[in-house]
């Protein structure tokens, strides 16, 4: 999930701030959260809320990376930013 996997791609002392809603969250995840009575934050650790892969790169390269991925037929979104505070924060 987010809390274990994303920090592994970052340098020591870094974390990530994820902006919820910056990608399409499929209805199945809302269904599972509601009817499975799963805490909202826990959904990010169990199901990644539909995120299949995270790539961390310099902010100035983000738009180009999204364009390249979309050029290959992939859905891509900028979902957050790297911070100088360890851990994963979801806003």
Segments (PLM) and residue ranges:
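Glycine-/charge-enriched secondary-structure boundary and capping motifs
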Residues: 1-91
